[in-house]
A protein has these predicted regions:
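Acidic/polar-rich alpha-helix caps and helix-coil junctions
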Residues: 35-270
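Polar, glycine-rich mid-to-C-terminal structural blocks
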Residues: 1-30, 194, 203
Length: 270
């Protein structure tokens, strides 16, 4: 993900990897309906997205002369490279190697456990005031220096999940979970993200959606409900014709009857 060899040892393949306009706007100019104001998620934005003028002492061998994105060296063409997981060279941190930052690959973060609890507590409702859910939700926000909330809406949860886990490959699964009960809502959301948009003006170092942008964006197909599920493989349908959907795309289901052939709780681990 590193955008130059000044911030990674020898190899830097992230020069053309940028934060999308939609995510950048959500980090820096989010309309928080619960708080009733526009908010800038400064801490997580700073550590997730490198934008012009952001100072990173941790990327320099001399913290008094920090690496400043776009100043120490030119910013990329989109001016918003991915900062998360970019931790500098071995001279800076003492352990990075070419093609190996030394960062652990997290299988499950505590913040994910907390937000999954909030999701479960909310269920199919659009908000929750469950005390434990609020405790966990606000614990995640406190770490990011964001104000606490006394009610969590689904939009709050979606936003928090996206901010906390940006570039970690988890956000899509949060949307899929929502689509189980609010399919069209998710499809509409996916089709209103200003995809493939240019938004950095290098001459002024400003960030705004290009005047020439038209939705849904260049080389972007509109999402449909079919994009939210993986089809059952042809090989599996051939082996079991009952898995073949009908003309409406539905698969016949029957209730499973538990009987003597199942192992009971007492013998499960014998």
């Amino acid at each position: 993900l590193a955008w130059s060899t000044m911030v990674a040892d020898q190899n830097a393949w992230g020069g053309a990897t940028y934060c999308s306009y939609d995510l950048f706007e959500e980090f820096s100019n989010y309309d928080d309906k619960t708080l009733g104001e526009k908010v800038d998620d400064k801490v997580r934005r700073h550590n997730s997205v490198a934008s012009y003028g952001e100072s990173y002492p941790e990327l320099s061998t001399d913290p008094s002369d920090p690496y400043v994105y776009g100043v120490t060296e030119s910013a990329g063409s989109q001016g918003a490279n991915v900062k998360k997981y970019v931790i500098g060279t071995k001279k800076v941190n003492g352990f990075s190697e070419p093609n190996n930052s030394g960062i652990n690959t997290y299988m499950l973060r505590l913040a994910e456990v907390y937000l999954n609890y909030v999701d479960a507590a909310m269920g199919s409702d659009d908000q929750t005031t469950d005390p434990t859910a609020l405790k966990y939700f606000n614990a995640v926000r406190k770490r990011a220096h964001m104000p606490a909330k006394d009610v969590v809406t689904y939009e709050d949860l979606r936003h928090e999940f996206r901010m906390e886990f940006a570039f970690e490959g988890l956000y899509w699964y949060q949307l899929i979970r929502r689509a189980y009960s609010h399919q069209q809502e998710v499809v509409n959301y996916l089709n209103n993200q200003n995809r493939n948009a240019s938004y950095y003006e290098a001459s002024t170092h400003s960030y705004k959606l290009s005047d020439s942008y038209t939705a849904p964006g260049p080389d972007v197909d509109l999402a449909t409900a079919a994009d939210l599920v993986l089809p059952i493989a042809d090989a599996d349908q051939t082996k079991n014709p009952n898995l073949k959907p009908d003309a409406n795309g539905n698969i016949a289901t029957v209730p499973y009857e538990f009987g003597e052939r199942e192992v009971d709780e007492q013998n499960l681990f014998k």
